[in-house]
Swiss-Prot record:
Region of interest (Disordered), residue spans: 48-67
Any single GO CC term annotated in Swiss-Prot or TrEMBL for this entry: extracellular region
Lineage: Eukaryota, Metazoa, Chordata, Craniata, Vertebrata
Disulfide cysteine pairs (residue numbers): none
One matching Pfam family: Antimicrobial12
Keyword Zinc in annotation: no
Subcellular location: Secreted
Protein name: Dicentracin
Record-stated family: Belongs to the pleurocidin family.
Protein's UniProt keywords contain Nucleotide-binding: no
GO biological process assignments: defense response to bacterium
Native organism: Dicentrarchus labrax (European seabass)
Main localization of the protein described in the UniProt heading: secreted
Modified residues (Glycine amide): G44
Amino acid sequence: MKCATLFLVLSMVVLMAEPGDAFFHHIFRGIVHVGKSIHKLVTGGKAQQDQQDQQYQQDQQDQQAEQYQRFNRERAAFD
């Protein structure tokens, strides 16, 4: 859906520019800028999700270590 919208918008921009305006380098730079912005949005979201996943895994490991230590203390108290 995003790609279709992007394609239609960029097509409109290209079709609206007249060849006599010598405007193509501006269009090309705009397309490159939009592409980079989309790339940042896509990879930025992935990086944030990876960071959240890593934090979740660390929290799980900490919780398991705490439970293991608590179990060992209780076991030592009964011995």
